[in-house]
Amino acid sequence: ISADILARTLERSGVKTEILGFTTRAWKGGQSREQWLNDGKPQNPGRLNDLKHIIYKKADDPWRRARRNLGLMMREGLLKENIDGEALLWAHNRLMSRREDRRILMVISDGAPVDDSTLSVNSAGYLESHLRKVIDWIGRFSQVQVVAIGIGHDVTRYYRRAVTIMDVD
């Protein structure tokens, strides 16, 4: 709902917006985990779940054309686990392909990065550490400004420019 409201508001102000989403393709791993098991479970394997990156609205599409896609966010069974760092890199790369003079990547988050398959065999905090590294890299080397809104979750521990909304009502 918040992405929908923000996109409509920004579009009315003449700001191009893209709405992206991310999740994993499976619970408790997928082909990545199967490959790791087939390889004899090497130590420190990294991500062990397959990513699903979703484009709900492209920047050049008007909100009216994309509004039905926004309903897919709530489709039962679609959203699983969250590998935030790689999703942030994907969104950043999409934004860098745009020609606008100013580029802002706004993250709306309801929780910390979590993927049980990955976290069960890597060091504690693996996904959070990766997210922090990605945010730091973008902040140092990119022209993209990252801002975040936490919905019921304090995102200020990850993002420097962030607000937290505890009660949406």
Residue ranges and their predicted role:
Residues 1-169:
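Acidic, glycine-rich A-domain
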